[in-house]
From Swiss-Prot:
The keyword Manganese does not apply. This is tRNA (guanine-N(1)-)-methyltransferase. Its main location: cytoplasm. Transmembrane segments: none annotated. Its EC number is 2.1.1.228. S-adenosyl-L-methionine binds at residues 113, 133-138. Homodimer. Belongs to the RNA methyltransferase TrmD family. It is found in: Cytoplasm. One of its GO terms (cellular component) is cytosol. CDD domains: TrmD-like. Keywords: Cytoplasm, Methyltransferase, S-adenosyl-L-methionine, Transferase, tRNA processing. Pfam families: tRNA_m1G_MT.
Length: 252
């Protein structure tokens, strides 16, 4: 996959993508990440990329022409078609199903806004989709772009050392439930012991426990996800057992 990022701070994205899963994906040739700076395509001695908004008001608005020229160069760098995605709090919420859709693309172009935003005419003419990573406002779209790069990259074939790792993540699978708790060594600690079932070696019992914990944790923390999940009789039985066994105060 190739991801082009249009940003006034392309080095920010490069730094975020240099580590962990995304860094390994680039080393393995599974991800090509390229940053483009609109300031390189601005005119005049000051290479201005923003100006005051019509109608007055605070802040500055990113100008059409530097963005248009930058996008033109970015799109010409690879022959494959690429949707232009603007990171915006007004966009479609980034979810795991949406991430899976985007992960199937061979290429995408991410646009990071700054200041009060981008001239609406550019968004109308050049942007295919707006995506939001949450109901809050950041100083710019770079953090959102870094999140999207990470989410999409880890879904590429061969990126994770264990493909099952992604399949067992929260929001994955047909039900989209939260993940179950995980434990490692030591089995006994001052802060608690590992559940006995996980040390039993009984794979059937372990699978049942994990499924029940996934259902229960979703019910406790994100109950609205259960409204869209397709649960069979066994799932409903496991969830009911979880509810009955829940100790007072554990609802947190």
């Amino acid at each position: 996959m190739r991801i082009d990022v249009i940003s006034l701070f392309p080095e920010f994205i490069a730094q975020c993508a240099a580590f962990g899963v995304v860094g390994r994906a680039q080393e393995r040739g599974l991800l090509e990440l390229k940053g483009w700076n609109p300031r390189d395509h601005a005119q005049g001695n000051y290479r201005r990329v923003d100006d005051r908004p019509f109608g007055g008001g605070p802040g500055m608005v990113m100008l059409i022409e530097p963005l248009r020229a930058c996008l033109e160069v970015a799109q010409a760098a690879d022959a494959r078609p690429a949707p232009v995605i603007y990171l915006s709090p007004q966009g479609r919420p980034l979810t795991q199903p949406l991430a899976r859709e985007l992960a199937q693309l061979p290429r995408m172009v991410l646009l990071c806004g700054r200041y009060e935003g981008v001239d609406e005419r550019f968004l109308d003419q050049a942007v295919d989709m707006e995506i939001s990573i949450g109901d809050y406002v950041l100083s710019g779209g770079e953090l959102g772009a870094a999140v999207l790069v990470d989410v999409v990259t880890r879904l590429q074939d061969g990126v994770l050392n264990d493909a099952e790792s992604a399949a067992q993540d929260s929001f994955e699978g047909p039900q989209g439930l939260l993940d179950c708790p995980h434990y490692s060594h030591p089995s006994s600690h001052a802060w608690g012991d590992v559940p006995e079932v996980l040390r039993s070696g009984n794979h059937g019992a372990i699978a049942r426990w994990r499924r029940q914990q996934s259902l229960g944790r979703t019910w406790l923390r994100r109950p609205e996800l259960l409204d869209e999940a397709t649960l069979d009789k066994q799932d409903r039985r496991l969830l009911e057992e979880f509810r009955r066994e829940l100790a007072p105060g554990d609802e947190k």
